[in-house]
Amino acid sequence: MNEGIAGKLAKQFINSKITPLLMVASLLVGLLATFMTPREEEPQIVVPMVDIYIPFPGAAPSEVEDRVARSVERTLTEIPGVDYVYSTSMQDFALVTVRYKVGEDAEASMVKLWATLMKNMDKMPQGVQMPLMKKVSIDDVPVLNLTFWGKDAKPYELRKAAVEVADQLKQIKDIGDVEVKGGLKRQIRVLLDKNKLAAHNVSAFQIVKQLQNSNTHMTSGTLVNVNQEVIVRSGQFFESADDVGNIVVGLYAGSPLYLRDVARITDGPEEVDNYSFFGWGAADHEGRQGEYPAVTLTVAKRKGADATVLADQVLAKVDELRKTTVPSGITVTQTRNYGETATEKVFTLLEHLSIAIVAVTVIVAFFLGWRGALVNFMSVPITFALTLLVYYLFDYSLNRVTLFAL
């Protein structure tokens, strides 16, 4: 009987005493790979996308569209590898999004795009400023959202607490972009008194220019002494309302005229231009009700990082900061955790695979006998285990696509 290569190979494994050890080892390394392979919600599909911000101060949306957006769309569509270009025109600027074909090199695409823009900048209308490019990838999607809210907390206080927490979270390894959305930023406002300006013979233009010149920090030169060179820096940035009020804006009756003499200066939240609330729906299992001012802190991961591990590290750090940084009247609630959902999907898959293996084994045993059932019971888990090992060795991640492939 001609067994062939496959038959001879199978015969060697059937007769070998190390075959059971290889089977057990395959199951163990597959189980280990399941926990070591990075888990994430979204697959690592390379679809280069770039957002281009083109400032055009003073232009209305219709003018931005006619004079900037349409011409840029036509120009960028001609770049090799570009799949789609679309734009949004708003007051003072245009947002152009360029999407490349799947598999295009992201860095090379950015270089080609920038070169094309610079080559055609002379065709832009007068007043258009230098464009700003920002690459968009799947890793920009936040894997964790933390919402700061409180019954008596103000939006300014919520944002201040969230920003302080965000600064601490940026020190964690493999963390990507950390953003704070909602709330009110700190703003120092200068409210000029026109009567005092007229009385002291000072114009608003003078004050604006003096504020711009004073809010700087630069290198003024160097001092050399005994073979040592000391760098001299002058000026400083404004840090408080007192710093702004102490700016000298002119002379009056031979004495310095300070900004606080002709204006009222406040240090507090900016003017409200958006509202963000946190609340519960009617189906909440604890019966909670109400809506409260809120600020959301979003955390994205770096490419290739494990969303589950990163989310656990962030949550552990936040638990520490609750005691030191977050005020007592502010509650931090987890509103999104892709690391948690990714882990749930992995274990749900393993559970369903186990049920399927047992069901198939029972059916095979009923119709073909226990020998065929035993082969099925052992071969299927080993195959999946080795597949998971291959995922780990080739730097794949466990996500909705790779899990579906299993």
Q: Which positions does each model-derived feature cover?
A:
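Small-residue-enriched core segments of transmembrane alpha-helices in multipass membrane transport
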Residues: 113, 362, 373-395, 404-406
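Membrane-proximal extracytoplasmic
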Residues: 1-357, 365, 375, 396-401
